[in-house]
Design a protein with these regions (language model features):
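Hydrophobic alpha-helical segments typical of transmembrane helices
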Residues: 24, 36, 59, 139, ...
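Short, flexible loop segments at the rims of nucleotide/cofactor-binding pockets, characterized by
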Residues: 103-108, 155, 174-180, 216-217, ...
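Catalytic core of membrane glycerolipid acyltransferases/transacylases, capturing the structured
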Residues: 88, 122-182, 208-215, 244, ...
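Membrane-anchoring hydrophobic helices of lipid-metabolizing enzymes
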Residues: 2-130, 172
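Non-catalytic C-terminal accessory region of glycerolipid acyltransferases
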Residues: 2-6, 10-13, 32, 51, ...
Length: 309
């Protein structure tokens, strides 16, 4: 009983420290001039490296999935760049609520927006399927500024306070947040039936009940949601990648053409086909800038075996 109490107390203190750190970085990056934000980034990167030090082998494995030739110094440099990119994600996301439409428009280059417009013209909604790549939050803010309703399904965190902080952050710039729980499916379909946009981070199977695919040469599972909702509602399924570009707040977004969701067999077979086609698109997007792929958790069966060993 005492051990459980001590563990809970320690976890609560850790959560409080993390939340405090996030809030400090959030407030500082909002008021500092662009030249000073680089200093904050330099401070934040080592902190993230400490908190996520156990994830370095996983990040290295992911870098080698994309670029098997990476070894030694080049691999270590790729891993370090991934941590730097992750720090930049948080810093530039925290800056979003205080930036104007003019600021956002000037800082992001979007290719393939016509795929979203054409899909919305069909009246069945749009599913934007994303890997954890670059500064994806910026694409959401930009879409909202174009006059579109954006819904995002988000993972519930172990810390309710931390989860609320990020929900409030996204709501502050117009995102309708759908928590990933037993009500999420209904909320997603309602949004699509209203011809809205739903964003789904789709390269990690959080619930462990996804669809088996081949992803960078190894079998694993990915979320069933994108394929299921697209086939169920007829909503267009569009892969999207957002990348950091050179310079503070500079981003590039690429919207790929819609994945084919035409029914050809059973629902199960069609879901498998659509999920695999989507992952092939993710591989294209990730290969463009693999060091910006923020996947710091085991995602393949071999990751879990390596972690145990």
């Amino acid at each position: 009983m005492t051990n459980n109490s001590e563990t809970q107390t320690k976890a609560s203190r850790t959560d409080a420290l993390i939340i405090f750190g996030y809030r400090v970085v959030s407030r500082v990056t909002k008021i500092l001039p662009p030249t000073a934000v680089a200093v904050v980034t330099a401070i934040v990167v080592p902190i993230i490296c400490v908190f996520l030090r156990k994830q370095r082998p996983i990040v290295a494995r992911n870098m080698r999935r994309v670029s098997p030739e990476l070894r030694g110094f080049k691999l270590r440099r790729a891993v370090s760049k991934s941590y730097q990119s992750y720090a930049r994600y948080y810093i530039e996301t925290f800056r979003l609520p205080n930036l104007t439409k003019k600021n956002i428009d000037a800082k992001i280059l979007v290719s393939g927006f016509e795929h979203i417009e054409n899909a919305l013209n069909l009246g069945k909604g749009v599913i934007l399927a994303l890997p954890h790549l670059g500064g994806w939050e910026w694409s959401g803010r930009w879409l909202i500024h174009q006059g579109h309703n954006l819904n995002a399904v988000v993972e519930k965190l172990d810390s309710p306070a931390l989860f609320k902080m990020f929900v409030d952050l996204r709501k502050s710039y117009g995102v309708n947040v759908i928590p990933l729980d037993d009500k999420a499916g209904v909320a997603v379909q309602e949004a699509l039936y209203k011809n809205e946009i739903v964003a789904l981070l789709s390269d990690r199977d959080l619930q462990g009940n996804g669809i088996e695919v081949e992803f960078f040469g190894e079998r694993t599972t990915v979320p069933a949601g994108p394929a299921f909702f697209a086939l169920r509602t007829g909503a267009a399924l569009l892969p999207l990648g957002t990348y950091f570009a050179k310079g503070l707040d500079q981003h590039e977004t690429i919207v790929r053409p819609a994945v084919d969701i035409q029914r050809t067999g059973s629902l199960r077979d069609d879901m498998s086909r659509v999920a695999q086609d989507l992952i092939r698109e993710f591989e294209i997007l990730i290969r463009k800038k693999p060091e910006q792929w923020h996947l710091f958790q085991p995602n393949w069966p071999s990751d879990k075996i390596a972690d145990v060993n």
